[in-house]
Amino acid sequence: MKLIYTEMSYSMTEILVNEARKAADQGYRVFYIAPNSLSFEKEREVLTLLPERGTFSIIVTRFVQMSRYFTVESSPSKQHLDDTTLAMIFYRALMQLKPEDLPSYGRLQNNSVFIEQLVELYKELKNAQLSVHDLTGLDHPQKQEDLIKIIELAETIMIQQDYNQDSPLQSFARAIKLGLLNNQLSKTVIVIDGFSRFSAEEDYLLSLLNNNCQEVIIGSYVSQKAYQKSFIKGNIYEASLHFLQDLAQKYHIKPVFAISNQVFKPAFSRLTQLFEATHDFSQVDWQLQKNDLDHFSLWQCHHQKEEIEHVAKSIRQKLYEGYRYKDILVLLGDMDAYQLQIGPIFDKFEIPYYLGKAEPMAAHPLVQFIESLERSQRYNWRREDILNMLKSGLFGCFDDSDIDRFEEYTQFADIKGFTKFSKPFTINSSRQYPLDFLNEMRQDIVLPLQELFKSQKQLGASLVDKLILFLKKIRLAENMQGLAQSQLEVEKNEEVWKRFTDILTSFHHIFGQEKLRLSDCLALIKTGMKSAQYRVVPATLDVVTIKSYDLVQPHSKPFVYAIGLTQSHFPKQIHHSGLLSDQERARINEIRNYRHFDIASAENSKKNHQTALSLFNAATKELVLSVPTVINETFDDLSPYLKELINFGLPLLDKGKNYLSYDNSDIGNYKALLSQIIAINRQDLIEMSDQDKMFWTVVLRYLRKQLRKQQLELPTSDYRLSTKPLSKEVIEVCFPKGIPLKLSATALTVFYNNQYNYFLKYVLNLNKTESIHPDSRIHGQYLHRVFERLMKDHTQEPFDNKLKQAIYHTNQESFFQQVYQDNAEAEYSLAMLEDIVRSTAPILQLNQNIQVIDQEKNFQLDMGNEILVHGIIDRIDQLSDGSLGIVDYKSSANQFDIGTFYNGLSPQLVTYLAALKQIAPHDINQLFGAMYLHLQDPKLDLVTFKQIDNTLVESIYKALTYKGIFSEVEKEHLSTGAYQTKNALYSNDELETLLNYNKYLYLKAAKHIKKGHFLINPYTSDGKTVQGDQLKAITRFEADLDMAQARRLVTLPAKEKKECFLTLMRKESHL
């Protein structure tokens, strides 16, 4: 064995490549071994250093891959074990054990996390060259007994199913020990680069290779100063020193110092020496030179997005200077925090990249499909799961529009559970859903699922066959091929599909002869899919490499950007969370010689120093170290390592926000520039965070309050949300000439509430999602229907009998049966409505001097100027003198207010009066009024009554009165009825004024509507708060910012309010 060490300023790879070339020139076969995470980059670096740029004599690979070169022909043809297969084997082993067989772990038999921990422990045992019987000295002896039962049973299953229990390195070591490879190894030289420690498995193999190979050469970075130190605790080279010293002691050799022809920039060497001096308690009498600082940059950004954008701009600048993507390496402090953001931002700047991390399959549509399938079976056809299956794009041949229509209907009809999905869809609404089409679609979905889900407990092989048949019926493979939109997606889908078929194969092999329920089968496949990962190789080598910073090696690339280096992530603190604690691992290691567990937490300090040293020397030209103030929505501090660099004299540059400038980095890329311009166009919306907006909104409110006390006024913000008018073509389609514009009292109210709301409801015809479950609209229909039946009943039956009959027959209508007999909640609502009917009905019995002459009367009122007002009058009454009036049923309290009417927010009663005047017989000229009847079950506070007497009854009937507009001429006839006429009497001239002004409101609104320009102007009554519909989710209206856009209502003092508003109406309606 030969041990080599060198300073950080030299290239260890060059030194080892020279050793490999010498061996190859002598006719030896050379294996150049690199760590798993670096083999790809190391191969490229080694080939670059070879003069011939390639050779068959030197193979750059990993330990595991090297073993296959020697054992591929002699290894037994057994099944391969991967993590998913191991998990299935442990699941099967636990199935065969009873809870009482496992005192410590009996309750965790079906826990997926516990099974994952068993897999990890089994792999650790293999790497540590230990068996489960070596787990002595545990905190609880019962743990070892349980683990022995589980693992031995699992190993028995592996033998029965012909799985290879040995790892590739174990098979290689066994072949060497048996002398099967002596001839080959005698002509082999092993070169090992990039290691600072070996696992027990690698350590054992190395001892065998040293005895049988021609030579084993190992290199590591250690300074001569550190090598001569006797005390190395806390030294930045502590990990490498321990590594070399242990090997030297074990194999009785002395490490030699070597140098390379290539010498890296002295700036990095000087920084390394300062870093070393800080940690070995020595001093240097010099500082970094001014030109050294040109090779280092320390950035500080506010949050991750800004940080990544600054890196992307800097990369674009490097390209402008003539460098290639492959010259750049990006290191991440927290891979999980940055992985989702860095891709879209690099795509925006058109930077090709390769993320050096296996991608989890959990977000792939195939995994989502399998998960939805499993949940559909487990939770009895839950609607969300069925829809998620369809939306994955892998179930059947359905268009997106068909799926949207199916989803809309199932939400409306509340279709959930097998019972409802299996029955034909029959319920419909005013939207007239295409039930024939939906039922065909329902059958295409239900039949294959029903066939699969009815499977009883049976052999696993039979379940897999049925699952495959189901997947064929729904055309899963064809749909999977149709998902890909690019070559990269095609490659990803191929990897995912291969993983999926491997999982099915493993399940069939392990559980083929075991009886299982379908739910267990789907759960196992789902767990395997969610935990699986895949990796896609980049199509070109000229890409920016992205990986975790703790996988970096010295002198990796000319330019290195390390981001996310906060105190929480640099250095990293690794802790085990498996079935064995670190203390238990340490006790096991004490009584074993060459076999031992790796205890990461025990090596955190020296490993972090080694990582920091590699990071500071990762670049050969320029190193950028960056830290965000906020990461994962949490404030974090500077890394202690970065603080050391600041003490060395490196300045911390605050990069600030990304503002558009004339720099090449800002305008040099079209796609990035376009996104910047779009962002600036929206600057008024996004320049502050939600937290900042909330803060300044509260401050502004407080400031206005203080100014008001001092009789000062703050100018209203001119910030406005603008809308564009409709094009002439659209106006002609929506409001064609010659066809009257159709309006209603409700539409007019919506228009004056907020013009944009009218545009959404009556121009775009946007509607809220319907539901079969009763809401206020359906409750109102029910109450209207009962009272309509009651008032039509002119028989001599007692009133109470008539009421019972009206309720009974209304309840028997098919629509109300579907709505109110669907569940207990709907039945309770029906009972409440019946109470309201019984409470309100007596008012109809008391008014014996009126006659109901019509109900649910449709009308069309011609307002002139091509305006047609339509509506339905709930009831038309006639007094004994022949005068007519209208009644509008309301499920909530309503009262006519002349101010509200003047502002266009309450035109209903006056509109109905105008319609009644038009449709009334010619011999009837007098109208006695228009009124609301609040359908309610009056609630009284009994505490306010001293005793239960007639006063209580009077209070109940006082709440049940007609409120609205009444004719002063009919005052005497109204006095005997339940009419609240106080402050509600109008003369005939005043009623005519109301009717004229009502017409003016319609004409004014119609004129504006036909122009096709709808403002975002919810109304405000006081100029401080907004009462109109703001539609925040659509318009982004904010009362404090957009008050200038709100429509200010006209308000008058209560004194002479009626007369003043009538005067205003006369002026405006005669303009």
Swiss-Prot record:
Enzyme class label: hydrolase
UniProt-listed GO biological process terms: double-strand break repair via homologous recombination
Membership in a protein family: Belongs to the helicase family. AddB/RexB type 2 subfamily.
One function term, GO molecular function aspect: double-stranded DNA binding
Matches recorded under SUPFAM superfamilies: P-loop containing nucleoside triphosphate hydrolases, Restriction endonuclease-like
InterPro entries: ADDB_N (IPR049035), DNA_helicase_suRexB (IPR014141), P-loop_NTPase (IPR027417), PDDEXK-like_dom_sf (IPR011604), PDDEXK_AddAB-type (IPR038726), Restrct_endonuc-II-like (IPR011335)
NCBIfam families, A to Z: rexB_recomb
Gene3D superfamilies: 3.90.320.10, P-loop containing nucleotide triphosphate hydrolases (3.40.50.300)
PANTHER family for this protein: RECBCD ENZYME SUBUNIT RECC (PTHR30591:SF1)
Name of protein: ATP-dependent helicase/deoxyribonuclease subunit B
Keywords, in A-Z order: ATP-binding, DNA damage, DNA repair, DNA-binding, Exonuclease, Helicase, Hydrolase, Nuclease, Nucleotide-binding
Protein species of origin: Streptococcus pyogenes serotype M2 (strain MGAS10270)
Annotated function: The heterodimer acts as both an ATP-dependent DNA helicase and an ATP-dependent, dual-direction single-stranded exonuclease. Recognizes the chi site generating a DNA molecule suitable for the initiation of homologous recombination. This subunit has 5' -> 3' nuclease activity but not helicase activity.
Subunit annotation: Heterodimer of AddA and RexB.
EC number assigned by the record: 3.1.-.-
CC cofactor: Mg(2+)
Pfam families the record matches: ADDB_N, PDDEXK_1
Misc: Despite having helicase-like domains, this subunit does not have helicase activity.
